[in-house]
């Protein structure tokens, strides 16, 4: 919950990854419902699992409509096919429709497509997910089991496809040097420095631009239990 508050405070877009899909009792759709209710964030699965628990074999990409399998000793061989397993076909159709409905609640262009009762194209669906994610109005949810490298590549692809690049993010920093100088000048002039000191503590806001030749700016933080 603390991480969620910080992400909202700083307008950080998010993807969600439900790990350990090979564990007993794994239920990704219950987790997605908790994201919606407890975090109050519209969310929907981008995939449905093929098999469950020890029989977790792969994923159906409901955006590109492909079955994806990670094979090899470390799951590093990715095999895709257009043949969706019959046992998950109806679930995949249902979750794709759910994805479209969730997006139509937060994206105007997808809402128009939904009202027209038209099936969105791949490009329209990807664009809608990206717009809603970048705007911090939606979280696409990916599934997998990291230790077996299943679903990890799809998550990385999702980061590239749906999260903003540095040029799309408004990055700001606090320049305390200028504010402190103004506070010192006000103090020397015998003026009320209370307001200026308050500004000095938090610093004046400065817009940052990604540039290799610019000075380094970093954010240091500490996590505590």
Residue spans of the language-model regions?
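Structural and coupling elements of P-loop NTPases
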Residues: 1-225
């Amino acid at each position: 919950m603390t991480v969620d508050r910080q992400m909202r405070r700083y307008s950080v877009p998010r993807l969600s990854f439900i790990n350990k899909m090979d564990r007993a009792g794994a239920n990704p759709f219950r987790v997605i419902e908790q994201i919606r209710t407890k975090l109050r964030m519209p969310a929907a699965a981008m995939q449905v699992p093929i098999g469950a628990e020890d029989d977790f074999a792969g994923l159906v990409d409901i955006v590109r409509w492909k079955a994806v399998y990670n094979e090899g000793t470390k799951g590093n061989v990715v095999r895709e096919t257009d043949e969706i397993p019959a046992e998950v076909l109806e679930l995949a159709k249902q979750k794709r429709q759910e994805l479209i409905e969730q997006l139509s609640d937060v994206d105007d262009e997808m809402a128009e497509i939904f009202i027209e009762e038209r099936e969105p194209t791949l490009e329209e669906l990807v664009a809608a997910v990206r717009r809603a994610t970048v705007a911090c109005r939606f979280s696409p949810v990916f599934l997998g089991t990291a230790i077996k490298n299943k679903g990890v590549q799809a998550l990385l692809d999702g980061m590239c496809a749906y999260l903003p690049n540095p040029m799309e993010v408004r990055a700001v920093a606090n320049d305390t040097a200028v504010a402190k100088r103004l506070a010192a000048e006000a103090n020397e002039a015998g003026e009320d420095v209370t307001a200026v000191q308050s500004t000095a503590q938090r610093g004046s806001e400065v817009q940052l631009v990604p540039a290799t030749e610019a000075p380094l700016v970093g954010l240091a933080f500490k996590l505590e239990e």
